[in-house]
Amino acid sequence: MSSVRLRKEIKRRGKDPIGHIPEIILNNFTTRLGHSVGCMFAFLFPHNLQFIRREVATFHNQRDCIFFRLHRYIFKSEKKGGIQELGPRFTIKLRSLQKGTFDSKYGDYEWVHKLWEMDISRRKLHI
Amino acid sequence: AAAGARWNHVWVGTETGILKGVNLQRKQAANFTAAGQPRREEAVSALCWGAGGETQILVGCADRTVRYFSTEEGRFQGQKHCPGGEGTFRGLAQVDGTLITCVESGIVRVWRDNDKEASSDPLLELSVGPGVCRMRQDPAHPHLIATGGKENALKVWDLQGSEEPVFRAKNVRNDWLDLRVPIWDQDIQFLPESQKLVTCTGYHQVRVYDPASPQRRPVLEATYGEYPLTAMTLTPGANSVIVGNTHGQLAEIDLRQGRLLGCLKGLAGSVRGLQCHPSKPLLASCGLDRVLRVHRIRNPRGLEHKVYLKSQLNCLLLSGRDNWEDEPQEP
């Protein structure tokens, strides 16, 4: 995880989002591994189709870095909408995906990020 | 696809119960299921060649059935339910018209191999101890099997002999802190032209045992990496083994000196199955990253083929035939 901005560091932020279930947007998770990881992020939040609160959490994948943002939106008019940033923002990169529960020593890994094998070429992306 | 099944080079069993046949020459992969939908309960846990050359494959599934697959016809022919003990199959073998199965709780059973009867009583039953990780048959002496597992030392059994093991390995001496070294044998191989066995452990050790020598402790011990070694295979020439661990690292280890010869790169997930061709320098590997890779082991070392198969791969069988490139033309 890198580039972390906690709530108190974000300027002009909205009110507390605690207790409200946001909607999820997953951007650009194209590969097979990316699709699995994207589904895992979506399942972190309870599934609620009621859309009561106007809050949305965005996971945007760009070049193997996933950017997380939390916004609240309002509709100012028919065509125009505005967003207000709440919540922390951070960037995360996938290090490994394990099969089963967390066991870093003896567990089976489904995908492991290997620096000297996978990051040699700038054009080859994994997520 | 069914007609060309006999020309497939690699057969892979998956976690969803599908048997996949891969033809590396034509770069095609085909799915073979016994019936209908793939299910997690039928996850393939063991594969071995059946009787009569490479015309039949025995597929051991997690629901304790062994299915017979014919490569000539390209379809499943029958199945046999093998109850007894708990856990999934850890080893399958065939000798003289009988089927040998070993499950995780340590029950080894020898069944009469007639696939017309769906289930029958076992001919012979052995208890090898709980927590078995692998049961392997000696290709030179088909009635000898070796078993090993977590806190279950390596034992060699003679199925035609008595109920006691022929060779029972002893644990190494206590380490430098005077603590008992734990045992976790993950894979076993018999070395040809001698009685020796090689095991790779979950504590990243590779050990060679010699039943002919008076000591029951390992003759040679080598370590590789920091992660559990999950699969092992012998190279043609049999002076070295290739091991794979849960991080997807493949390494070739020399058995004469116990040193690392080289590594193979490419895998991103835990290695589940490894097999070398008996004469060509080719190694097939499959793992949890859902890709089957064929590497060339020497001159030059590198990746030959890479095939994405959509489910997690559990075990594989590499065809040992020599005419890899020669294929008959379609009429």
What are these regions (language model features)?
Chain B
Residues 126, 131-212:
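Solenoidal tandem-repeat scaffolds enriched in leucines and small polar residues
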